């Protein structure tokens, strides 16, 4: 797999240039000025070549390609669907558009709010962006989650620029789909500025049984779908998954220098409890604890990287959830929990396992709570009814995973026409 890290490559180039000079000093090599100048020129050319190559290999996001989408936005009333992740370098998309005299009339904000600091599921009121004065229309204000007719009449085109993590129960894509539906209904255009999927290198999990459709499961896709938001938007249109089989007028600005084997490391945490790549990689396996009494580390420095409960026994690791920004009232608040720390697992081991239900099975068997362990939210997260049944029957994680293997292969074939990037 290709790991995309431009800063690392640039640092290596600088170090290479310094090492050339140090070699001569360390070995007391005396060269006349002409030879030294030629050697330094050669080193400069080589370093410049390596730097150009590093720049060519760097993933270029959709929002960075302003020459591609500025003409589309000319003379349009613009709404954006974004949050704190919608950055172009050190500036937000909103600021870039306003600096270039575009008419931004509204911001639609997802779960966690426009600034990305609200708790999971917390109601966030609509407001006004203090810096720019642009109205923020919250999709998580406790109402329908779909924008009103009045808000839809304000703009001509919706620009989507938000970092997703590629999981069916991560809510940003569901908010995007609701906006696509509204845009289809009111004949508004949609422009997705695509971003890499940090979990885009594999597909895993059961396809959602649509009787469990909810805010944490909006489409008939596996838990780990392996698609970018741009690809997913194209699939929503192509498969006519919007209500009443509607389609919207959709344009996608794809990333450059990106494939589904590019392991893209996010420069900004996408939400308060996914603070780093380890949390993002373990999220597909540990999120199910949200539907149990077990703590998954909210209120600690290791959210989604640990799990435990005050009554779990036989473990050497323990932690105590606290009230912190982004997790004001976490499960098992203030209680000493005993359990497992997964944060020391290598990324490679996590990728090899994919979705690993052994953690949930371990806690279920240890606590011996039977029907009191799972809440109905579990089916909304996993997307089917057979997983809970198989766990209660004593089946292993491998046996359960074998059950959804056909779902994974079916979806890979179904999604293929909509992929923008090499698998």
Protein language model annotation of sequence segments:
Residues 1-57:
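Bacterial Sec-dependent N-terminal signal peptides
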Residues 116-121, 191-213:
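Glycine-rich, charge-decorated loop segments at or immediately adjacent to ligand/cofactor-binding or catalytic sites
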Residues 256-333:
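Glycine-rich, aromatic-lined ligand/substrate-binding cores of catalytic
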Residues 213-283:
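Conserved anion/nucleotide-ligand pocket segment
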Residues 105-111, 193:
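Short internal beta-strands
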Residues 303, 307-405, 423:
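Conserved functional hotspot residues or short segments at active or partner-binding sites
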Residues 125-155:
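Glycine-rich oxoanion-binding loops at beta->alpha junctions
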Residues 164-176:
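Glycine/threonine-rich flexible loop motifs
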